[in-house]
Amino acid sequence: MSLLSRMRKINDMLQKSGVQHVNFREMAETLRDVISANIFVVSRRGKLLGFAIKQEIENERMKKMLEDRQFPEEYTTGLFKVEETSANLDINSEFTAFPVENKELFKTGLTTIVPISGGGQRLGTLILARLNDSFNDDDLILAEYGATVVGMEILHEKTQEIEEEARSKAVVQMAISSLSYSELEAVEHIFEELDGKEGLLVASKIADRVGITRSVIVNALRKLESAGVIESRSLGMKGTYIKVLNDKFLVELEKIKAS
């Protein structure tokens, strides 16, 4: 397959990421197929975002690492010393992707490290590993292009996370601002009683203890539920089951109580 054909396959991956969520496993599989190497996409903190294996490595430590989807902290920290593509590192390199405890088995193994950057920051690392053939210039062009595409997807995910967090916070603030003073007081007591994200409460008991009417509690819960902040379910004589759906709710409630 020509360099152009292989670049087009990576480009297809880029086009797809613009219109739908592309998972990192699919990205790793595409890079594995066009570069013919084991591919590991590693986050800043060493989390294995995605990987694809061309040549199986029979080693228990490596298998566990892939199962846990986490690279060792020391190795991950070391990767940040690599600021530009480092190609064809042998088994004696501190960055080898092959198990050093089996040096004799993997003595021909070569590793290439490609930093993943975007938005002026280091986002992670693309690691490529081969047992025999060295990585040539075409492979490195594809690897660096692939790292750029992966970086764009990481940035896209980060942006989505920030937007989702802002939306969640706005929904909670609107829900809380819709409560009357007595309803807000009732809500504070309800979640003191729950002492967590979900649980069972008896509205009449709280009403009697705090000195508010049961209808105030019911109205407060109804408003929070219609905003999608909580879900509640009546269990008859046992009380009402409540579950917090929006993680920002309890945080905002604590801020109000502390102010």
Curated annotation (Swiss-Prot):
Domain of life, source organism: Bacteria
| UniProt-annotated location(s) | Cytoplasm
DNA-binding positions? 203-222
Q: Which GO terms describe its molecular function?
A: DNA binding; DNA-binding transcription factor activity; GTP binding
| GO terms under cellular component | cytoplasm
Q: Where is this region: GAF domain?
A: 1-155
The GO biological-process annotations, alphabetized, read as:
negative regulation of DNA-templated transcription
Could you tell me the keywords of this UniProt record?
A: Cytoplasm, DNA-binding, Phosphoprotein, Repressor, Transcription, Transcription regulation
List residues traversing the bilayer. Answer: none
* Phosphoserine, modified sites: S215
Question: What family classification does the UniProt entry report for this protein?
Answer: Belongs to the CodY family.
Family annotation (HAMAP family)? HTH_type_CodY
Explain the purpose of this protein.
Answer: DNA-binding global transcriptional regulator which is involved in the adaptive response to starvation and acts by directly or indirectly controlling the expression of numerous genes in response to nutrient availability. During rapid exponential growth, CodY is highly active and represses genes whose products allow adaptation to nutrient depletion.
NCBIfam families reported for this sequence = codY_Gpos, PRK04158.1
Q: Write down what this protein is called.
A: Global transcriptional regulator CodY
User: What is the scientific name of the source organism?
Assistant: Halalkalibacterium halodurans (strain ATCC BAA-125 / DSM 18197 / FERM 7344 / JCM 9153 / C-125) (Bacillus halodurans)
